Amino acid sequence: MKTETFSTEFGGRELRVEFTDLVDQAHGSCLVSYGDTVVLATAVMSKEAKDGADFFPLTVDFEEKFYATGKILGSRFQKREGRPTDEAILSGRIVDRTIRPLFDNWIRNDIQVVVTVLSIGEDDPDVLAVLAASIALGTSHIPWNGPVSAVRIGKNAEFEINPTYTQRNTDNYQMDLLVCGKEKKINMIEVGSSEVSEEDILKGMEMAEKELSKIQTFQEEIISKIGKKKISIPKPQLADEVITLFQEKIDPIFMSKVFSGNPGKDELSQLVTIWSEAIAHLDDNQQSLAQDFLQEKIDEVIHHESIANQKRPDGRGVDEIRPLYAKVGGISKIIHGAGTFYRGGTHVLSVLT
């Protein structure tokens, strides 16, 4: 078996990346280990674009296996794997949300990224899953604007980098911060905490940034040594007619519809309807590109107005929250309790018996 191994210090312990011919038909693969936790990541892309696809067909799977614990649980060992656990679903989403923004959204080739937990120790595999997926993609020929890194910052009495399950399962564990990003740009955050100060959150982010930078450099070194040359998937060209139609039909009403001051989405729906009618005579490919073009323009102006003018589409400033309302009871004397909570247009009724 051919192997090539790279290692670095990560949170005071060894992070190990191994390349073997175990999965040599995948376009990219690697084994990543941290303590006794080991994950395998594979990345594959179809040769041709998916017929009729008007979206980027990326699939991310996070697979847990019974054997990873080194135990046979229960009196009857089930040979079949069941549905994914909540933790597996959430870990898969962490990987997806981290890597997806770094693909060009005009790609129509099927891409699959599968992370399999081979061994589970005291370290959570979700951080390793992000790193393994990034390295598998980065060393493959699949076009991707990575690498991207991940780190967990915890706080008991002191801040800890990549705390173990034991360290996290204590009464005074105050903060669990998972940060993913690249080149001092963060594209995914998950945090669960008690009532910690803003200073603690900021310190955790600063610690995360330093670790992300170190792992970014580590990945870049690996990719420079063994990474394959990326293939090029040219961006489909938008017809000049689409630009002209946008200027005629959308430009005059664009800002008033996007920044309507209405917390609902009626105006945006109207904008999409007007645009869909304007491009209805175009072929399917140009219609798909035109819809992407509209969404890009909406995203662009929302980002610009939020940063430059501190303005949100519903009229709020960036430091304003939606109106809040809460009420106890008011449903019936028969039920034991009820509560109503509003945050803007989101209304929740909870009933207890």
Question: Whereabouts are the PLM-identified features?
Answer:
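Glycine-rich anion/phosphate-binding loop at the beta-strand->alpha-helix junction
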Residues: 16, 40, 95, 105-152, ...
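Amphipathic alpha-helical transducer elements in NTP-driven molecular machines
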Residues: 92, 126-130, 198, 202
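Mobile "lid/hinge" segments at catalytic clefts and subdomain interfaces of large enzymes
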Residues: 141-259
